[in-house]
Amino acid sequence: MKELDQLTKGTTTVGILADKGVVLAADRRAVMGNLIAGKQVKKIFRIHDYIGVTTAGSVADAQKIVDLMRAEARLYELRHNRMISARALANMISHVLHSSLKAFRPYLVQLIVGGFNDDDPALYNLDPSGSIIEEDYTATGSGSPTAYGVLEAEYEEGMSLDDAIEVAVRAVKSALERDTGTGEGVTVVTITREEGYRELPEEEVEKLLS
């Protein structure tokens, strides 16, 4: 399907599983064809205190999916008196993506869902068909081949959160330097049991980029 090519025209997002949580990172550039459409575009979103999601692809479709995820998370909490797990939410959105594809109205997005299943951190990659894969590390967008080069070389199972942050920043930075669809700096989010969803301060990220 020709529209799915849009998923590779801009953006680099990265997710890494660490010993005590999850790290999500993304650039801030939005492109439209060969034009830069935005330089401060949000690509990492809080769903609740212990789940975050990165988006690559159509900005409009991404916002619809994020709104749906937030609504489903709130509804689940009201019904069950506890927060939805990352696995349950990823499975739920997988069904939505698959159903939209079968109806020939696909959501042109690829997602990385990071968060917790009870006390265990987890990371999932979802594509527009609804395919869902649990990962130790993953990347999406046009800069993902470059980012994967860093991830595959530097990821270590059980690595600390601080080390995972550094690797995530280096992975996106490598795409900033080589992919024209990626640019305008890096946003980094950590999700831990102790602090929940936390976006790193700009100055902290800048130190890692320098």
Curated annotation (Swiss-Prot):
Tell me the keywords, alphabetical order: Autocatalytic cleavage, Cytoplasm, Hydrolase, Protease, Proteasome, Threonine protease, Zymogen
* CDD domains on file: proteasome_beta_archeal (cd03764)
State the InterPro entries in the record. Ntn_hydrolases_N, Pept_T1A_Psome_bsu_arc, Pept_T1A_subB, Proteasome_bsu_CS, Proteasome_sua/b, Proteasome_suB-type
How, per the record, is this protein's activity regulated? The formation of the proteasomal ATPase PAN-20S proteasome complex, via the docking of the C-termini of PAN into the intersubunit pockets in the alpha-rings, triggers opening of the gate for substrate entry. Interconversion between the open-gate and close-gate conformations leads to a dynamic regulation of the 20S proteasome proteolysis activity.
> What catalytic reaction does the record list?
Cleavage of peptide bonds with very broad specificity
A GO cellular component entry from the record: cytoplasm
Q: Where in the cell is it found?
A: Cytoplasm
Which Gene Ontology terms cover its molecular function? threonine-type endopeptidase activity
Annotated GO biological process: proteasomal protein catabolic process
State where it is primarily located: cytoplasm
Q: What domain of life does the UniProt record list for this protein's source?
A: Archaea
Cite the Pfam families for this sequence. Proteasome
Summarize the protein's role: Component of the proteasome core, a large protease complex with broad specificity involved in protein degradation.
What's the subunit arrangement here? The 20S proteasome core is composed of 14 alpha and 14 beta subunits that assemble into four stacked heptameric rings, resulting in a barrel-shaped structure. The two inner rings, each composed of seven catalytic beta subunits, are sandwiched by two outer rings, each composed of seven alpha subunits. The catalytic chamber with the active sites is on the inside of the barrel. Has a gated structure, the ends of the cylinder being occluded by the N-termini of the alpha-subunits. Is capped at one or both ends by the proteasome regulatory ATPase, PAN.
PANTHER family the record matches:
ATP-DEPENDENT PROTEASE SUBUNIT HSLV (PTHR32194:SF0), METALLOPROTEASE TLDD (PTHR32194)
Return the protein name.
Proteasome subunit beta
According to its UniProt entry, this protein's organism is Methanopyrus kandleri (strain AV19 / DSM 6324 / JCM 9639 / NBRC 100938)
